Curated annotation (Swiss-Prot):
G proteins are composed of 3 units; alpha, beta and gamma. The alpha chain contains the guanine nucleotide binding site. This is Guanine nucleotide-binding protein alpha-1 subunit. GTP binds at residues 43-48, 151, 176, 182, 204, 270-271, 273, 329. CDD domains: G-alpha. GO terms for cellular component: cytoplasm; heterotrimeric G-protein complex. Transmembrane segments: none annotated. SMART domains: G_alpha. A lipid is attached at residue 2 (N-myristoyl glycine). GO terms for molecular function: G protein-coupled receptor binding; G-protein beta/gamma-subunit complex binding; GTP binding; GTPase activity; metal ion binding. The gene is gpa-1. InterPro entries: Gprotein_alpha_su, GproteinA_insert, P-loop_NTPase. PROSITE patterns: G_ALPHA.
Length: 357
């Protein structure tokens, strides 16, 4: 399973080196170039925001490029099932359908041996379908906040038949749901109203963060992506640290960094759809992450307002303007609306007083 991920990561590394070289050569951008830095903790959705910029402001993904994502879709689907099985075992939940024990063995062997599927063979397709239909797996999925599981798991499980079609080509929505950790720096470049925007996405995992700061001291604005729905989840890296608390600490480091004192900050509170589901349907209290929260337990707006205040409080300079937007990064229309508002604000120089121009 690691082969397709390795190819994707190798390409990221190649592009990252190229970008770093360009940054070293041209430290200061031309006045017609606006450099934006896209930051956020791992799995916040920042790479999805970057993909949306390609879709909205560039030509999106070519058919050839989309075809190369088939491996990633298949890998993400099998990896998600492996994580779901692992979570089920941690919770001591058993399969209802006994055949799923054999399917579990296939999943584990596939993950350990890095077997690649494109598309799934009959055995893997049957295994994934039977497992997703099993009541034990569904019970574990209902408790997914207790273990690590990618947000895209259900999306891909519900699309198994389509993904397994011989002529399957990943759609833009499929690509938006794929997940390969960002290693190094990835860039999207586009033009808007006579300006060239260069947007840089940098690795969000702990091991990646120290690599980017010095390269972007001339960024015009920071877009920090924070996942609202991670308040009841732990980090993939250590499986103990609360994800939202980690994101807050990273935001604190960024917003107070000496390189970004005069840089405007735009905060995307992302995954609002998943957040609403947890607050309203699953009734997962915000007090899981914040003992101090005393607002209504099933009031999404009250909870978001509280989280908003927590992020703003991270800035040592209380006069620093932080522009906040609620987003669902997989919703192209919603992201387009937010991005247009953000970019128009930048172009109209409304952020001039905060050092944008």
């Amino acid at each position: 399973m690691g082969n397709c991920d390795s190819r994707e990561l190798a390409e990221q590394t190649k592009q990252s080196k190229k970008i770093n070289t360009e940054l070293a050569i041209a430290k200061k951008d031309d006045e017609n170039v606006i450099k934006l830095l896209l930051l956020g903790a791992g799995e916040s959705g920042k790479s999805t925001v970057l993909k949306q910029m390609r879709i909205i402001h560039n030509s999106g993904f070519s058919q050839e490029e989309s075809m190369t994502k088939r491996n990633v879709v298949c890998a993400n689907t099998i990896q998600a099932m492996g994580a779901l099985i692992e979570g089920m075992r941690q919770l001591r939940i058993d399969f209802v359908n006994r055949i799923c024990n054999a399917h579990e063995k296939l999943i584990r062997e596939t993950l350990s041996e890095n077997t690649e599927y494109n598309p799934f063979n009959d055995a893997m397709y049957t295994a994934l379908s039977d497992l997703w239909a099993d009541k034990g797996i569904q019970s574990a999925y209902g408790k997914r906040e207790l273990f690590y599981l990618a947000d895209s798991a259900k999306y891909f499980f519900d699309s198994l038949a389509r993904i397994n079609e011989p002529n399957y080509i990943p759609t833009e929505n499929d690509i938006l749901h794929t997940r390969v950790p960002t290693m190094g720096v990835i860039e999207v470049k586009f033009q808007m109203k006579g300006k060239v925007f260069r947007v840089f996405d940098v690795g969000g995992q702990r091991s990646q963060r120290k690599k980017w700061i010095h390269c972007f001291d001339d960024a015009k604005a920071l877009i920090y992506v924070a996942s609202l729905s991670e308040y009841d989840q732990v980090l993939l890296e250590d499986n103990t640290t609360n994800r939202m608390q980690e994101s807050l600490q990273l935001f604190k480091q960024v917003v107070n960094n000496k390189y970004f004192v005069n840089t405007s900050v735009i905060l995307f509170l992302n995954k609002v759809d998943l957040f609403e589901e947890k607050i309203i349907i699953k009734k997962r209290s915000l007090t899981i992450a914040f003992d101090a929260y005393t607002g209504p337990q099933e009031d999404v707006e009250a909870a978001i307002t509280f989280i908003d205040s927590k992020y703003r409080a991270m800035a040592d300079n209380k006069d620093k303007n932080i522009y906040v937007h609620k987003t669902c990064a997989t919703d192209t229309h919603q992201v387009q609306y937010v991005l247009d508002a953000v970019l128009d604000t930048i172009l109209s120089s409304k952020l001039k007083g905060c050092g944008l121009f």
